[in-house]
């Protein structure tokens, strides 16, 4: 009896969802449409900003070109600080794309009360408000640092699992599983909590009252994007760096 109840409780918990999803049915698949729809908005913002900044490039930058150059310098310094002068260039596009996508997604979630926008079914939300998005970004990061290690060291990359002593093999394997989990849940939890608090306050009180909290949400959203991109760079650097280099660092 207790076993059957525990199984029922497990399945009831597994069926719980955060928010009301806007489902798209494609073939036999059911996907979260709000993630794709708002992701398109994020892509559109980034593409339009890039075109506007590079349409008329001037030797003395001004306006949006000046802003874009500042962003590029910031991303270059971020990648260089994590990967070093020799290794950062090939990985700058990946780390920069991660940062910009997460940053714009987070700010859209902090600035726009998506949950108050009524749809025939479900609700809109920032892409990073969905655990599937954050897990996908974390898995991409995992694939990136595995690729970095294998491309530089070949199959010898996996020898680090046996260092400094083979008995640590289970812990090293567990560490590689916890890296994407920590990245995804940290980002998901922070963005979801911020959106929920702002949505509830906007619903209960006049818009002026939640403004300070929205400003704090903007700061937190930027920090989360920076943390994710920084850790991604650190993990890739760890995969590229040999044990000999670590000892002399």
From Swiss-Prot:
The subcellular localization recorded is:
Cellular thylakoid membrane
Per its record, what are the GO molecular function terms?
Answer: proton-transporting ATP synthase activity, rotational mechanism
Q: How does it sit in the membrane?
A: Multi-pass membrane protein
Query: What UniProt keywords apply to this chain's record, in alphabetical order?
Result: ATP synthesis, CF(0), Hydrogen ion transport, Ion transport, Membrane, Thylakoid, Transmembrane, Transmembrane helix, Transport
- InterPro entries named among the record's database cross-references: ATP_syn_F0_a_bact/chloroplast, ATP_synth_F0_asu, ATP_synth_F0_asu_AS, F0_ATP_A_sf
Which residue ranges does UniProt annotate as crossing the membrane? Answer: 33-53, 92-112, 131-151, 196-216, 217-237
Q: Which residues, by range, are in coiled-coil regions?
A: none
UniProt-listed CDD domains? ATP-synt_Fo_a_6
Q: Which Pfam families match?
A: ATP-synt_A
Gene Ontology, cellular component aspect: plasma membrane-derived thylakoid membrane; proton-transporting ATP synthase complex
Indicate yes or no for the key word Ion transport: yes
NCBIfam families named among the record's database cross-references: ATP_synt_6_or_A
Biological role: Key component of the proton channel; it plays a direct role in the translocation of protons across the membrane.
Can you state the subunit structure given in the record?
Answer: F-type ATPases have 2 components, CF(1) - the catalytic core - and CF(0) - the membrane proton channel. CF(1) has five subunits: alpha(3), beta(3), gamma(1), delta(1), epsilon(1). CF(0) has four main subunits: a, b, b' and c.
- Report the sequence similarity comment from the record: Belongs to the ATPase A chain family.
State the protein's name: ATP synthase subunit a
Q: Supply the source organism for this entry.
A: Microcystis aeruginosa (strain NIES-843 / IAM M-2473)
